[in-house]
Regions:
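Catalytic cores of nucleotide-sugar-dependent glycosyltransferases that transfer UDP/GDP/TDP-activated
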Residues: 1-167
Length: 167
């Protein structure tokens, strides 16, 4: 969706941004209006296929051995991207780290949605080549309880009371 790195070392696919109009429309229909029909499901899968191909191009272009998924496999704010990445990782077996900040089951808007089957398939995926990392012990217990997945704990905190040291 977007990057803050050198454009020569970056692969950006506009369809990957969760604020992209079509994705915002999908989210509105599923999570606000609570509606899903065959046309919407087909569109989700069509975008998923395009994104999966983009992920593959990215991996091949940069000859990656690992992929790091930063909070993309925990919250379904971009269903097609999460599905694409989960499916790609499952099919290729590429090693990956899924870094989770928070999960869909922590947000009321995602509970009981008409896309529950899609959410459970990819958020988080249970593929064995994925190393799950969470930022707190509550999330570590919840991912184990809800998804049967072990997760490593790497706290994502900063001390805002003290000034940072020199770089």
């Amino acid at each position: 969706g977007e990057a803050q790195t050198d454009p020569g070392r970056t692969h950006i696919d506009g369809k990957a941004h969760f604020l992209q109009d079509e994705i915002a429309g999908i989210n509105e229909r599923i999570f606000e209006k609570r509606k899903r029909d065959d046309n919407l499901t087909r569109r989700i899968h069509s975008i998923k296929r395009d994104l999966k191909a983009s992920i593959d191009r990215f991996r091949r272009e940069y000859e990656l051995d690992w992929l790091v998924a930063e909070n993309v496999l925990s919250l379904p704010v971009h269903l097609p991207l999460g599905l694409a990445l989960a499916e790609y990782l499952s099919e290729t077996g590429i090693r990956s780290i899924a870094h989770h900040h928070d999960f869909w089951w922590e947000r009321h808007r995602f509970l009981g949605s008409p896309a529950d089957d899609l959410i459970r398939a990819a958020f988080p995926p249970t593929t064995p080549n994925i190393l799950h990392v969470v930022i707190n012990s509550i999330a570590q217990r919840q991912i184990a309880h809800r998804a049967g997945l072990p997760a490593h704990l790497i706290p994502n905190v900063m001390n805002f009371h003290d000034k940072p040291g020199p770089p």
